[in-house]
Amino acid sequence: MAVATAAEKPVALIISQGGLGDQSYNDLAYAGFKKGLAETKLVGKPVESKDVVAQAADILRRASDAGFGLLIDLEYSHGDTLQTVAKDYPDTDYVILNQIKSGKNVASVLFQEQEGSFLAGALATLVAKDASIKGMSGKPVIGVIGGTKSVGIDKFIVGYIQGARAVDPKAEVKVAYSNNFGDPAIGLQMAKAMFDGGASVVYQVAGGTGLGVIQAAKQAGKFAIGVDTDQDGLAPGFVLTSMIKRTDVAVETVLKDYADNKFPGGQTVTLGLKQDGVGLSPMTYTKDKIPAADIAEVEDMKKKILSGEIKVWNAVDQGYPDYFK
């Protein structure tokens, strides 16, 4: 583990696909980064790239050569490269989000996205089945749009489907991938097709592309479900809820540990429902539109997940279930 004072070594946050301004994953992590810098007096900056996936090794090696003492990497596809690079720079500390990588100077941060997504799928299905709610078909038909076909994104989607089918075993969940995290126009087009095809609620797991999903929900008079941050206010009344993933807390905590020379090298930090690392938003603009019984049912499911009575499938650890192959 690298030992350095704040004055000696600055820190960097490597921004993932979709970039800053996505009003989602990257922006929330960056908010935590800025807060952590202010609280610790560390010096640091975000690192962006036009092709963050293809340039993984170049990005990580340049940042390491530049003298950063800590690199926090938000890009899922960088995992293997980061583990390799970390071996060549033993005096630099590295953090990778959303997967486990080994190394004395590597810390891994995992989120139990499947748990929050389970609750999102359950709520979406309960609401879609209720024709008394404006815009809902009365049928258990919902959708989800992922930013890319990867196990990291499918972790959300599998949990969402499991939650939907916990409410109604015959629930239909339309699944599509935008193959892009920064194009709202694609998100709007794909979500419109889902709404036109009968979906009443569409969950976006596509970063900035998902902003188009929210726009499509507003245009169709349906519901979107936001992700990572509380996106309910982006289209008040048309974002049913958001599956919040507290990347801000994770990044801020790592910075504090680093500043205190307590960097968790070689360790994995896991944040799920139990740690308030994931969960649904307060539904500020929609709670009064949804029957209290539906909200209570979702809350009961949350308690059962916390108690272990409901076990949510983790696609990263368990592979894919039969219903998603």
Where are these regions (language model features)?
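A residue-level marker of the well-folded mature domains of exported/periplasmic proteins
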Residues: 4-325
